[in-house]
Amino acid sequence: MKDLLAFLVSGCAIGGGILKILPAKAFAKEAPRTGKWYGFGVSVDKCIGCNRCVEACKIENDVPREPFYFRTWVERYVIKKDGEVIVKTIETKPEGVPEAAVDRSILRSFFVPKLCNQCADPPCVQVCPVGATFQTPDGVVLVNAKTCVGCRYCIQACPYGVRYLHPQTRTADKCTFCYHRISQNLLPACVEVCPTQARIFGDLNSAASPLARFRRMNKIHVLKPGLNTEPKVYYASL
């Protein structure tokens, strides 16, 4: 088990990303002193890989039905006793995800939901030549499709691989935390449909928000902290 922990923290597990347990004080520099500052939590041990979140996102945000276009997706990680790591994206199917066969060579298997990390210091915003990618005052990175020229600079700059070029509009697209919903005090579609409450959304500046409670009660990881993008998607139970 010590070897597994070392493997996870070393950065080889989650999509090549670097994982790090962060103390509570590390979050203080992200949020402005006033106003809302949105973030997201994922409880890995609660995710069952049902893909309801993915389906809800595609419907809510008119994401292309082709399997390689996602605003959010779920990956299955299988860590074997010999150190081999197998990563597969769970496909969206009406019948759900089939049960994994019993394999005594497997040390650990789990699901990891992925989405835009809504970085506090987003590289995608910095590289956009026309200002189409921007950050709202409440910390959500959006794309103005009317001004996006489809140059793909932001897609290349994103270290988390969460952006894609929409095949119809030919503009950059990605997760927005369902900004049209949260602006009306509704939850993101993926959070609303999750049957196990594995996804948590909230205001980082509110001590009473579900996300604040999630961070207080769990050891938190973020993806690729060494890049200093200050991601605002926090993972527990990795």
Name each region found by the language model:
Residues 1-238:
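Non-ligating segments of multi-cofactor redox enzymes
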